[in-house]
C-alpha cells in the first residue's frame, strides 16, 4: 500500500461516543482502576512492573481469577504506566504516583480520552508483535541479551507484518464494496499478506504459510480484543487439536467462521486511522471537508466513492444556507483544467441534494458555456418552466464534459462503456460534430470512445475524430 495515494474515506462515530467506548474497554478500565488503587505502599521493579508480591492484590482488585489473572493484571499495570495514568516517583525506592493523564479520563475532553486510549492501543500492538517467549532462558546469550536468531524472531519484520495486516483490515472495512459491518474471515486476511495478487492456484508451500499466519493472527487478535480494537471470534480449538485424536463431536469443515472471524470496531477504525495518519498516509474521514470551501469539497470528493461523496456533501450542505451554497458550488465548478470535468460532475451530484430554493442560482448560469448544460438538466428534472433549450454546441460540450468526468472518476468502467455505445447509437453523426467541440478533453474523450466501443467500424470513426481534434488544437 502506497502512502502517496489517498485511502477511501472512513465514516467515524462522534468522538464523545468513541470516548465512552474507550472508557468501557476491559483493558483501559482495568488500567484506570489500578492507577487509582496504587498508593504509597505500591512497589515496582526496575522495569516498572509491579513486584511479584503485589500482583495478586492487583488481580483481586480487578476481580481476575484463573490461570491468566496474574498476567492480565500485569498487562493492565503496564498499560497504566505506558499511558501516563501512573508514574514512577522514585526509581531507587520503586514508588509510584498518579500520572497527569489519570484525571483526563474523568475531566478531559473526548479527544483527551481517546489520546489516552490510543496510547494503550500502541502498547498492545507492540506486545502483539512479540512471540511467546516460553523458551526465553535458552535464548539468552552470554551477556544476558536476547539472541533473536535463536528465537527465529525478527522484531522489525514482525511489527511490519502486523502493521500490514491491520492496514489491510482497515482497507477492507472502509472500502465501498467491502464487507461493511460484516466480519472478515481470518484465512482471507492472512492470505492478503501471503498470496501474491497474480497467483492463480496457491501452492502447498503458500497454503502452509497462510496457515502459519492464521495461527499467529489468532494469538494476536485474542490479545488485541480487550483494548477494543476488534471484535474477534477465535479459531475453533478443535481445528488445532491433535489429528490423531477423535473429535468430541462432528465438525463442519465448510463453516468458514470456525477458522476465525475479525471485525474492526468503530473505536478500532478511529485508532487505525490515527496510526495511518501518523505514518504519513492520506486517510480522510467523512466530515473533514464540512467547514471548508466549495472548491475544497469538489476537489476533495473527486476520488471518493459515490456513497462517501454524497455523505460528505450532505454534511457540507447542512452547514450552509441552500441558495448561497449552490452559488458557491457553481463558482467552484468552473474551469478548463484537467480536474474540472470531475468537479462539475460532483457539483451536479451535489445539486441533486438541494430543493427548489436553488432555482435562482441555476437560472443565473444558463448562459454560462461551462455550467449552462448542467443547469438545464437540473431545472428540467425539477419541472421548471421557461427554460431555454440548449444549443447544439452546448449539448456536445456537455457530452464531452460528462464522458471526461466519468473517465476521471471510474476509468474504463462498464458504465462508461454503455454510455459510449449509447451516444454513438443515438447520434449517427456524433463523431463528425464531436471533434470540433472546443473542450480541452475532446481528443482524450474520442480516443477513449474508440478504445471502448465494441464495434470496430465505430471505434475507427472515433479514433479518426480524435486525430482531427488533436490536429485542430495543434496536438
Feature locations, PLM:
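Alpha-helical adaptor scaffolds
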Residues: 315-317, 377-430
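Generic helix N-cap/helix-start motif at coil->alpha-helix transitions
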Residues: 290-295, 304-311, 326, 337-346, ...
Amino acid at each position: 500500500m502506497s502512502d502517496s495515494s489517498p485511502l477511501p474515506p472512513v465514516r467515524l462515530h462522534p468522538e464523545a461516543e468513541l470516548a465512552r467506548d474507550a472508557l468501557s474497554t476491559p483493558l483501559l478500565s482495568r488500567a484506570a482502576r489500578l492507577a487509582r488503587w496504587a498508593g504509597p505502599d505500591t512497589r515496582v521493579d526496575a522495569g516498572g512492573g509491579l513486584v511479584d508480591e503485589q500482583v495478586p492484590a492487583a488481580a483481586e482488585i480487578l476481580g481476575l481469577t484463573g490461570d491468566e489473572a496474574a498476567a492480565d493484571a500485569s498487562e493492565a499495570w503496564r498499560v497504566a504506566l505506558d499511558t501516563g495514568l501512573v508514574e514512577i516517583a522514585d526509581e531507587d525506592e520503586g514508588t509510584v504516583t498518579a500520572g497527569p493523564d489519570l484525571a483526563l479520563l474523568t475531566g478531559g475532553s473526548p479527544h483527551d480520552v481517546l489520546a489516552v486510549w490510543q496510547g494503550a492501543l500502541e502498547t498492545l500492538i507492540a506486545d502483539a508483535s512479540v512471540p511467546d517467549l516460553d523458551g526465553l532462558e535458552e535464548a539468552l546469550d552470554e551477556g544476558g541479551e536476547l539472541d533473536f536468531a535463536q528465537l527465529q524472531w525478527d522484531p522489525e519484520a514482525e511489527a511490519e507484518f502486523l502493521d500490514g495486516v491491520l492496514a489491510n483490515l482497515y482497507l477492507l472495512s472502509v472500502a465501498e464494496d467491502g464487507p461493511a459491518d460484516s466480519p472478515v474471515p481470518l484465512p482471507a486476511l492472512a492470505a492478503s499478506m501471503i498470496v501474491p495478487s497474480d497467483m492463480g492456484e496457491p501452492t502447498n508451500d503458500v497454503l502452509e504459510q497462510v496457515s502459519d499466519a492464521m495461527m499467529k493472527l489468532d494469538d494476536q487478535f485474542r490479545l488485541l480484543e480487550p483494548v477494543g480494537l476488534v471484535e474477534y471470534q477465535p479459531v475453533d480449538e478443535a481445528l488445532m487439536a491433535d489429528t490423531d485424536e477423535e473429535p468430541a463431536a462432528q465438525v463442519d469443515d465448510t463453516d468458514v467462521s470456525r477458522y476465525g472471524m475479525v471485525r474492526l470496531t468503530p473505536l478500532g477504525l478511529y485508532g487505525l486511522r490515527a496510526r495511518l495518519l501518523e505514518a504519513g498516509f492520506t486517510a480522510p474521514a467523512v466530515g473533514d471537508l464540512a467547514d471548508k470551501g466549495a472548491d475544497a469539497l469538489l476537489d476533495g470528493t473527486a476520488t471518493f466513492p459515490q456513497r462517501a461523496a454524497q455523505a460528505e456533501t450532505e454534511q457540507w450542505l447542512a452547514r450552509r444556507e441552500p441558495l448561497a451554497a449552490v452559488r458557491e458550488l457553481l463558482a467552484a465548478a468552473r474551469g478548463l483544467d484537467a480536474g474540472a470535468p470531475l468537479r462539475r460532475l460532483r457539483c451536479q451530484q451535489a445539486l441533486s441534494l438541494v430543493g427548489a430554493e436553488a432555482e435562482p442560482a441555476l437560472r443565473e448560469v444558463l448562459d454560462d458555456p461551462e455550467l449552462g448544460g448542467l443547469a438545464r438538466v437540473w431545472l428540467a428534472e425539477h419541472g421548471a418552466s421557461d427554460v431555454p433549450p440548449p444549443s447544439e454546441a452546448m449539448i456536445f460540450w456537455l457530452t464531452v464534459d460528462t464522458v471526461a468526468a466519468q473517465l476521471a472518476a471510474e476509468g474504463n468502467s462498464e458504465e462508461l462503456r454503455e454510455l459510449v455505445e449509447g451516444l454513438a447509437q443515438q447520434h449517427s453523426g456524433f463523431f463528425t460534430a464531436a471533434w470540433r467541440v472546443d473542450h480541452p478533453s475532446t481528443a482524450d474523450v474520442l480516443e477513449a470512445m474508440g478504445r471502448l466501443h465494441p464495434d470496430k467500424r465505430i471505434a475507427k470513426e472515433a479514433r479518426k475524430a480524435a486525430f482531427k481534434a488533436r490536429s485542430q488544437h495543434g496536438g
